[in-house]
Amino acid sequence: VTTQAVSGQSFPFSPIDPRERRISAAVMMSPSMPRRGDPKKAFASVAIPWLLMTGTHDEAPIGKQTAQSRLEVFPLLPPGDKYQVVFDGAEHSAFSDRALPGDSKPRNPNHHRAILALTTAFFDATLRNDAAAKAWLTKDARSVLEEKDVWQTK
């Protein structure tokens, strides 16, 4: 949620604007829907590139975020340099080095290889203006994923 706040999500009930203007691209691991307000408005002002990463079993150990609610963020983002990967079978801990208590799915070592490839290309494309990295994200990123993983761009 912090990354979402500092990189463009709006919070209508907040007296301050949490956006950090020096951030020009951001990666969301386990994106979250807003707890209050209109979700469409919350994400309408995201003006920088975002890469969202989640899994088909990405349930929050605290809070009320579900694997399904995490998938609801991407469609609400405005078009232009927005990307999402959904790792098949991945739980909330897929983005860490170890499983969390209560995890029930076996960890997939390819997820970390894909995370490394996707985030490196994303930051190369967005922060270094690397045309080859951007082309890879839009045309070939699927090559590091497994058959049931989902890759989306807009």
Question: What are the roles of these predicted feature ranges?
Answer:
Residues 1-45:
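Primarily recognizes the serine-hydrolase "nucleophile elbow" in alpha/beta-hydrolase
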Residues 7-15, 91-96, 146-154:
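Short flexible/disordered coil segments
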Residues 13-16, 68-75, 137:
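Intrinsically disordered, low-complexity boundary segments flanking structured domains
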Residues 21-36, 79-89, 115-124, 154:
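A short, hydrophobic secondary-structure junction motif
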Residues 44-116, 125:
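Active-site-adjacent alpha-helix of alpha/beta-hydrolase-fold enzymes
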Residues 103-154:
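Catalytic active-site module of serine/aspartate enzymes centered on a nucleophile-bearing elbow/loop
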